[in-house]
Amino acid sequence: MGDIVTREQVASLITRYFSQQISDDEKVAALNHFRQTLHELSPFTREPVDLVLWVKASEVVANDYNPNVMAAGEKKLLQHSLQEDGFTQPVVVSEEKGQYLVVDGFHRQLLGRRESGAGKRLKGWLPVTCINPERKGQAERIASTIRHNRARGKHQIASMSDIVRDLARLGWTDERI
């Protein structure tokens, strides 16, 4: 019947691999590789949260259409939360043309870039999860951002109207919007 490899043996090999003298960049690349492999085998492969990757903050690009505005007090609370609790939610992105475009989590990624607080711990990296690959393009990103913002009930009416107008100009029907 062939050799059976146990979870404990796999875990031992991974531990041995990471106990070698390798740089943080190499460790992050290996973590992302292993996570990607596990994600491909996962029964939850269609769920973006099943694969959280670490990417260089310089590869994460803010969108230019987000109608979400955060009050100073809320931003301070988010900063405190990131400092005390760490990142409990990844930045939601769309991977396009070698960049990660922010769909949700603009303020998390902004605070995660800082050289103090949580940003200092992250050493220039940000946790991201990518929206499903078929959701590529500006219209799909905008629609996803709206869904994330409206689910939280935080958005600006005028900015939301501008986005709806832009989606209509891109050929989206009222039903699709």
Locations of regions flagged by a protein language model:
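N-terminal leader or domain-start segments enriched in small/polar residues
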Residues: 1-78, 94-95
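Amphipathic, charge-rich alpha-helical segments that serve as recognition/docking helices
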Residues: 63-89, 109-176
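Short active-site oxyanion
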Residues: 97-101
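Short, conserved phosphate/pyrophosphate- and ester-handling motifs at nucleotide-, phospho-/glycolipid
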Residues: 105
